[in-house]
Amino acid sequence: MEINVQAIVIDNGSDTCKAGFVGEEAPHSEFPSIVGIDQNDSYVGNEAQSKRGILTLKYPIERGIITNWDDMEKIWHHAFYNELGVAPEENIVVLSESPLNPEENREKMAQIMFETFKTPAIYVENQAVFSIYNSGRMTGIVLDSGDSASHVVPVYEGLALPHATSSLGFAGCDLTDQMSLLLNDLGYNLEREIVRDIKEKLSYVSSDFSWEINDPSTLGKSYELPDGQVITIDKELFACPEVLFLPYAFFGTNLDGIDKAIYNSIMKCNDDIHNDLYGNVVLSGGSTMFPGIEYRMYKGLTQLAPSTTEIVINAEPDRKNSVWIGGSILGLVPNFQELCIDKEDYDEYGPSFVNLVKSFREQNHQNYYGEN
């Protein structure tokens, strides 16, 4: 059934909700994925953030998974009516989901969209698949690292391969914690948002950590605090994002770095697609924005992969918004509406239909699911 309405894209991040219209190059709106409540009212996004001192703040998405549906509904309502100024019943809604989103969560997303917001059709897709679309390819392996969740997901011909998908035990919030500890060691006890700002503006990935950490000529960078005090930060700037590559050195646990996690994921896929995956290693999400990460990833994978392997790291300048942009691109394909689940299907088959559609797609790629 063809639906003559526009489509909107919502990327549901643990830290930030990004919303906008299909065909646009960037989200129309970005706001914190938080709900603030007092005795009488609730506030969403930036308004909740600005009143955080007098509100109880709630975060409905934890480590990429929606855990509070009432508050998530408030965030979607805010995105539709306040940020985009649209009526959801007049728009197809494209939604991102965590690579390891439980089936019951996917059904709940569909239920709220159709029964509460009366949207005519939806499309729910793995965040990593959207990131692949933004790379201009249909096959590759994605490292998506946001504020509270990181995943490695191989994608073959537009379909994520779940048996080789992994969730990493660290993300941007953990890097912020690490930066806070490093700054505390220097005698700076700073608010978390200031620490996060330092991390995002000044940190970088070292090309050779063991050498640079012992190099006395490493130059520090200055940062002006809100009170006007200027502090100088040195090795902490590259020690913080080193968590991505050497998490076990910081957390004391048996965690793989992002390069080793990508290698392990590829090794779980059939041999005949290894070169395709190595040929499009896609970096996605805000925690992949550190300068130097592209070279370090290439260096790490070169040491792990067979010597004749061609490795291509795809680090788009706009990769912080890769998921949203990929959803926007999807909405432009000629048969987009045929891929959607419409209200008629939902009314006939119920919420479980969204999982039946996903299973059908996976069955068409069964040949690439076997482990080596």
UniProtKB/Swiss-Prot annotation:
GO molecular function: ATP binding; hydrolase activity; myosin binding; structural constituent of cytoskeleton
Gene from which the chain derives: act27
Reactions that this protein is recorded to catalyse: ATP + H2O = ADP + phosphate + H(+)
Cellular location(s): Cytoplasm, Cytoskeleton
Entry superkingdom: Eukaryota
Free-text function comment from the UniProt entry: Actins are highly conserved proteins that are involved in various types of cell motility and are ubiquitously expressed in all eukaryotic cells. Multiple isoforms are involved in various cellular functions such as cytoskeleton structure, cell mobility, chromosome movement and muscle contraction.
Keywords: ATP-binding, Cytoplasm, Cytoskeleton, Hydrolase, Nucleotide-binding
InterPro entries reported in the protein's UniProt record: Actin (IPR004000), ATPase_NBD (IPR043129)
UniProt lineage: Eukaryota, Amoebozoa, Evosea, Eumycetozoa, Dictyostelia
Protein name: Putative actin-27
Any one biological process term the GO annotation gives: phagocytosis
Taxonomic source organism: Dictyostelium discoideum
Entry keyword annotation includes ATP-binding: yes
Known EC number: 3.6.4.-
Pfam (any one): Actin
Protein family membership: Belongs to the actin family.
PANTHER family, per the entry: ACTIN (PTHR11937)
A single cellular component GO annotation: actin cytoskeleton
Main enzyme class: hydrolase
